[in-house]
């Protein structure tokens, strides 16, 4: 699979990122390089290797799952440009 200028343009549009036309070829090359590295993982022989989540066996202590409201709603909403009735108000993203 090869990433083209059109692919970069489409991903940029979907991500709502402004990418100048003169950077499309450069970014396509970078993405193709990244995908090439990822494709190399398909060449690794993992036959007989047990799946793992980490190479280090670490036991993490569990805490009680207690629901709280945080008691800082006013502080959190103070950072928001807009809020109503204790909730964030954000611009509509999907039409």
Swiss-Prot record:
GO molecular function: asparaginyl-tRNA synthase (glutamine-hydrolyzing) activity; ATP binding; glutaminyl-tRNA synthase (glutamine-hydrolyzing) activity
Superkingdom assignment: Bacteria
Subunit structure: Heterotrimer of A, B and C subunits.
Gene symbol of the encoding locus: gatC
Species, as recorded: Hyphomonas neptunium (strain ATCC 15444)
Record-given protein name: Aspartyl/glutamyl-tRNA(Asn/Gln) amidotransferase subunit C
Gene3D superfamilies per UniProt: Glu-tRNAGln amidotransferase C subunit, N-terminal domain
GO biological process: glutaminyl-tRNAGln biosynthesis via transamidation; regulation of translational fidelity; translation
Keywords for the protein's UniProt record, in alphabetical order: ATP-binding, Ligase, Nucleotide-binding, Protein biosynthesis
Catalysed reactions, as listed in the record: L-glutamyl-tRNA(Gln) + L-glutamine + ATP + H2O = L-glutaminyl-tRNA(Gln) + L-glutamate + ADP + phosphate + H(+); L-aspartyl-tRNA(Asn) + L-glutamine + ATP + H2O = L-asparaginyl-tRNA(Asn) + L-glutamate + ADP + phosphate + 2 H(+)
Signal peptide start and end residues: none
Family: Belongs to the GatC family.
């Amino acid at each position: 699979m090869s990433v083209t200028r059109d692919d970069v343009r489409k991903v940029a549009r979907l991500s709502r990122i402004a990418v100048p036309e003169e950077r499309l070829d450069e970014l396509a090359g970078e993405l193709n390089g990244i995908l090439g590295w990822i494709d190399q993982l398909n060449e690794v022989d993992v036959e007989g290797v047990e799946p793992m989540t980490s190479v280090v066996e670490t036991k993490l202590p569990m805490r009680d799952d207690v629901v709280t409201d945080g008691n800082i709603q006013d502080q959190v909403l103070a950072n928001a440009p807009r809020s109503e009735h204790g909730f964030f108000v954000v611009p509509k993203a999907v039409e």
